[in-house]
Amino acid sequence: MTDLLWRPAAPADGHVAACVGETMVALAPPDGIALRQTAGLALDVAGAESNVAMYLADHEVRSRWVSRLGDDVFGRRVLHRISAAGVDVTAVRTDPDRPTGLLVKDPDPAGTRVSYYRRGSAASAMGPDVLSSPALRTATLWHLTGITPALSDSCRELAMAALCDRPAGRPATSFDVNYRPSLWREPPRELLRTLAQAADVVFVGLDEAQSLWGDGLREATDVREYLPDPRILVVKDGATAATAFCGDASVTVPSLKVDVVEPVGAGDAFAAGFLAGLLKDQSAERSLRTGHLTAASALRVTGDHGPLPEPGERRRLLDIDIRGWCETR
């Protein structure tokens, strides 16, 4: 197995990952019914960074979520849900003047459509001052995504400060490109490349890399040439495979075969699984496998956060040979 060559320094009491970003209340028809046909809506929460924090907690990695919520019933629901998943939410601040963001899902066989109501939300008012939080200063890893800089000018400044301003002693950083075209007036090609180049660990889908930076990025190795600076770059190729580049070395692990219920949240789950492997000193191959099996748990449910396999099954999946892995459903 190929080692990852680099990983964040671990203090005596172990790693702590702090995930920074917006989480909204999510409304969706139950059982995948189209919005126009449903008689009711189920309420859940949705946020890329809090998804990562919750899955890290599932993997017994200490995690914190840092954000802002409105002083409203939706904000209290979000806080309760994430806290109940085992995530430290003590750094979340309440804004009495701004609401908690909201999204509505409309299931469709061609792909779930999502409508966002987040303009002027409490989280959109976050800025670089968030980085002074003790929850961040005492963490060993910060995780952000490309969603945050799309929310507002101050959130863009937050992302730039977190990833690009690197004074001595700053925690390691993880960045999921997570390009959402609907959040941008035009593709933020240079901004997201700048943020990715500045991070220690980067996640990007091959398809989103092509959408952002051109069809010339045909393979994972092309993306590595375009993003040479991250210590670890993970390129995901959907249902095919994921490749981790660690310095000049690389390792590829095929995706698990999954009967997909809904793809939303799978990328966050993969990132959390891989980071859990990294922080637990697993090899590149085992970290990728942990990413895949965590993503599979999200793909099998309608929400963003699904249950992991039992610990014994996880160990079996990490230990089986590549043929057995490829045959697993």
Q: Where are each of the predicted segments found?
A:
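Hydrophobic faces of well-ordered beta-strands that scaffold small-molecule active sites
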Residues: 65, 173-175, 202
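Conserved phosphate-binding/catalytic region of the ribokinase-like
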Residues: 1-18, 217-329
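A generic structural signal for short hydrophobic patches within well-formed alpha-helices
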Residues: 122, 131, 149, 180, ...
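Glycine-rich phosphate/adenosyl-contacting loop at the front of the ribokinase-like
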Residues: 2-87, 325-329
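Conserved phosphate/ATP/ADP-binding segment of small-molecule kinases
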Residues: 169, 179-250
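Short, conserved phosphate/pyrophosphate- and ester-handling motifs at nucleotide-, phospho-/glycolipid
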Residues: 56, 205, 267
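Conserved N-terminal subdomain of the carbohydrate kinase-like
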Residues: 62-147, 171, 315-329
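Active-site metal-binding loops of divalent metal-dependent hydrolases
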Residues: 23, 147, 177, 269
